Amino acid sequence: MQLLLLFLLLVGPYVILTGLSRWTGFKTAAMIRARIGISLFFAFTALGHFIRAEEMSAMLPPAVPYRLQIVFVTGILELLGASALWVPDLMRPTGTCLILMLVWFLPANIYSAIYRIDFGGHGAGPAYLLVRIPFQLFLMWWIYWATEQNWLEKKASGM
């Protein structure tokens, strides 16, 4: 259920603003509509890092030191990312950093699903990963597109 809410936060503004632009004639660039959703997504998920920090820290293996501090720092990074998307000179590097952060978070999501940590759907066990991993890949692609990344194209054309 939480992933559905996150998906709606992510793509809802794009869909709503696209509909409004067709109805009212008010035009907004597609990538701006997408970045609104990305900002809402990361602002919302950052709140969890502060409101439910103890529960979120359980998503990290016990051997990881400073788990609670890591949760707070990553929450701050998510808020900074949500904001920095709107600074023109920072948009692309912020997009890259958000994608890398999502790659960095994936092992915690896998760990918490395997050990059924009861936070954000992970209590469902490994089956949750059948939904979570494709969602995370979609999220990374959405950020890549909305922040006008081109490093995949550069790599492909250099081959």
Q: How would you name each of these model-derived features?
A:
Residues 1-159:
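Membrane-interface extramembranous regions
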